[in-house]
Amino acid sequence: MIPVVALVGRPNVGKSTLFNRLTHTRDALVADFPGLTRDRKYGRAEVEGNEFIIVDTGGIDGTEDGVETRMAGQSLLAIEEADIVLFMVDARAGLMPADLGIAQHLRNRQKATFLVANKTDGMDPDMAAADFYSLGLGDVHPIAASHGRGVAQLIEHVLVPFVGEKPEEVELTEEEANAAYWAEQEGETLEGAEEEPEDDFNPQDLPIKLAIVGRPNVGKSTLTNRILGEDRVVVYDMPGTTRDSIYIPMVRDEREYVLIDTAGVRKRGKVTETVEKFSVIKTLQAIEDANVVLLVVDAREGISDQDLSLLGFILNSGRSLVIVVNKWDGMSEEDRDHVKEMLDLRLGFVDFARIHFISALHGSGVGNLFVSVLEAYECATRRVNTSMLTKIMQMAADDHQPPLVRGRRVKLKYAHAGGYNPPIVVIHGNQVTDLSDSYKRYLMNYFRRSLKVMGTPIRIQFKEGENPFAGKRNLLTPNQMRKRKRLMSHLKKG
């Protein structure tokens, strides 16, 4: 499961600066959910292909109301949920009484805790870290988060060892993909060029992991129980590895699913909605672990900024998406039309996602959800060969030529699959990285229409072709050498 990293420490020690460094953002992907303090921020980081959830817990001031009182709130919850705790101190201010109190509580929690001395710019790192060894938390990692100094070493020493070595993925090289394409064009049979290892993988043999997420009280609990209570076979309730999330294997229409329930444990027959204890960590982990995400929104409240924040995390994770508008029953036609207008206005950027209007309480529209879930999963895991992708790319270029870059036309050579769930198309060519964003969006939409991809984001990656003459001297031919010799002798006589 994706590890959680909590940043803790006194106010103004640089937690937000380090948060932005690790997540490569200026703000959090998910923030300001009910039940959370406003200075809590959540973000997603990727280190050498390994994903982490970063939590900025806000300042803990041990001198104001007491460390115990402060840490008993949301910051303590984040520490309990975290796999790694980065305890940040201010190297310029030195060791403070609040640091001692926080360190004592972290030692009692027995978490993987690492001491980070920030604001060491302009200082000797060893001298800056010396005072903090008395906290008894092991080595001190000096950094300057505002300038990025020491952050790479911190990641290398703390985060990378935590996840261990990632198995090396077997990918089709550029030469293999190019050879496969031209072999298909010429009708030749090139052994090994048809990406045979992928033929052994059939996504239909695996259960679809389906996560139901949304803000509190939008009906996730009711929808979960409605799904489990209708014509399907529930195998058993199996606690998952995510904190408080429940993995529920089930079968519907002879298709296996694993329902990732983020609403907590409940009795199967209970469908009454209660105020849910919302956990951002639990929700983000469920999204990362799912194949398809059902995002539930309240028809009576419309699309809120919190819904859009959660939607942004789903898209950044590359997960397939089905939008569920719940509590549709009992609304007047005028109110329904208004809701649909707002959905069109605020969700125009996810036009690939199916939208379902349901009543989880009464069951209307719930059965149709699985049609879109299957469609999204099949589109996200579909295998498309190099020949087909290159043909679509050429059709797109014929319909709308690539623009000129520095007076030269961008040349698209060939395309091949770069990954699945979400689908990734890799386009090779000259100057392709200089293409405008508008043309990149055009190519993405063209591939989506041609492949009929629905319910899942699609990503386009661009790779420059190598110049075979780069770094080589321009050698003259024997004929050119003779001409050059005659020209030089003529100039000397003149």
Curated annotation (Swiss-Prot):
One of its GO terms (biological process) is ribosome biogenesis. Residues 382-466 form the KH-like domain. Residues 3-166, 208-381 form the EngA-type G domain. GTP 1 binds at residues 9-16, 56-60, 118-121. InterPro entries: G_ENGA (IPR031166), GTP-bd (IPR006073), GTPase_Der (IPR016484), KH_dom-like (IPR032859), KH_dom-like_a/b (IPR015946), P-loop_NTPase (IPR027417), Small_GTP-bd (IPR005225). The keyword Membrane does not apply. Keywords: GTP-binding, Nucleotide-binding, Repeat, Ribosome biogenesis. It holds the Pfam family KH_dom-like. GO terms for molecular function: GTP binding; ribosome binding. GTP 2 binds at residues 214-221, 261-265, 326-329. GTPase that plays an essential role in the late steps of ribosome biogenesis. Belongs to the TRAFAC class TrmE-Era-EngA-EngB-Septin-like GTPase superfamily. EngA (Der) GTPase family. Associates with the 50S ribosomal subunit. This is GTPase Der.
